[in-house]
Amino acid sequence: MQETTVKRDGASPSDAGTPATTAQGLGKLYIRTFGCQMNEYDSDKMADVLRADQGLELTDNPEDADVILFNTCSVREKAQEKVFSDLGRVQHLKKQNPNLVIGVGGCVASQEGEAIVKRAPYVDVVFGPQTLHRLPDLIKRRRAQGVSQVDISFPEIEKFDALPPPRVDGATAFVSIMEGCSKYCSFCVVPYTRGEEVSRPFDDVLLEIADLADQGVKEVTLLGQNVNAYRGAMGDSGEIADFAMLLEYVHEIPGIERIRYTTSHPKEMTQRMVDAYARLPKLVSFLHLPVQAGSDRVLAAMKRGYTALEFKSVVRRLRAARPSLTLSSDFIVGFPGETEEDFQKTMKLIEDVGFDTSFSFVYSRRPGTPAADLHDDTPQDVKLRRLQQLQALINQQAAAIAQGMIGTRQRVLVEGPSRRDPNELMGRTENNRIVNFPGVPRLIGHMVDVVVTHAHTNSLRGRVAGIERDTSGAE
């Protein structure tokens, strides 16, 4: 789980631009985002719709805001409790600004609904992931009626038709192609908070990406809870496009030079998807493929729908199609009933497959899920020890991959100034590694060849190919 203040690609919230004058006047919007890239995308859309309708511009200071929104994540219990903690910290701002609107969106909102208002009666608006486009009306009704507004319905794909055109800042962009999940893993709340899988129409996705390309976007990341389960309607023909077909068409859009996607499910990795890595050079050599565990017994209890051997078979076919492919994954340690033998099978899978990074956590019980009723007698200290061992192994594998990149020439999309040194540049390799290097601002938004000179824990350092070798080793 991660948390951010909403921002555009390559820009901080304070870089959002000069507020525009509208019929509603000037105003400031503060959004705090918890969780996944889907939530980051949704936060961007909240900003878009409130800018278009009410002239609100982003601020990174909640004390300056006229509207404060928390876009929440319910995957883990700690994330859920942190939302209420943060809500308490902004409650006093209502005394300073009686017209301040405080809203809660995202998966906690979808799960808790009116209970949020009962627990925190100063919250004005509660909305789900599928009703963020209704934010302007919810805020207007709250101000007109003086009553908290709650809308956590699942109106299919309606929100995409109601959202304003995407605003581009930088050479990268997220594009949501589907919503929800129909897998119903025993530990997961997503099907209950975001609804079942619903895919956007094929043509709508392509038109949005083409529009982004016209505005200078070179890299798109296709988003979905199970993005490779995409099944989009093709016009009025009644035909359905699968995810592999969508990738093939996106690959042909002029101006798009890189394609990423997240999050995928091993069960949906069809042979046509595997073949795409051999046929589509714009598809990056990096894949996030959650496995969760390496024990067949635990995988069955999780209702993941595959065995460890089947997962490894998918990886083997992918790497046969694209030998340079690097993988990241998700792991849950301490799932109810996990034995030491089960855990060692997970460690063996990690050793056999090799990962570049992972999102790994101790199991967090989520009320309302089937796993919440399972008996869990594993001590917390044992779970934490297992998590540390797992993370240490993956960190070791990641370090080896980074060391192996030293001296190689990497194609890098330059995203902006380096966070460590604003006089330098930062970009990403195909395999999703951050590279810091000396360069001039005109390179931002362009692809450049960078020779990797040093490997650090969370980043690489390099020099633009053809420029005198950098020997500083600074991060």
Swiss-Prot record:
GO terms for molecular function: 4 iron, 4 sulfur cluster binding; metal ion binding; N6-isopentenyladenosine methylthiotransferase activity. It is an enzyme of class 2 (transferase). [4Fe-4S] cluster 2 binds at C181, C185, C188. GO terms for cellular component: cytosol. It catalyses: N(6)-dimethylallyladenosine(37) in tRNA + (sulfur carrier)-SH + AH2 + 2 S-adenosyl-L-methionine = 2-methylsulfanyl-N(6)-dimethylallyladenosine(37) in tRNA + (sulfur carrier)-H + 5'-deoxyadenosine + L-methionine + A + S-adenosyl-L-homocysteine + 2 H(+). Keywords: 4Fe-4S, Cytoplasm, Iron, Iron-sulfur, Metal-binding, S-adenosyl-L-methionine, Transferase, tRNA processing. Residues 403-466 form the TRAM domain. Residues 1-10 have a biased composition (Basic and acidic residues). Belongs to the methylthiotransferase family. MiaB subfamily. NCBIfam families: miaB-methiolase, MiaB/RimO family radical SAM methylthiotransferase. Catalyzes the methylthiolation of N6-(dimethylallyl)adenosine (i(6)A), leading to the formation of 2-methylthio-N6-(dimethylallyl)adenosine (ms(2)i(6)A) at position 37 in tRNAs that read codons beginning with uridine. This is tRNA-2-methylthio-N(6)-dimethylallyladenosine synthase. The gene is miaB.
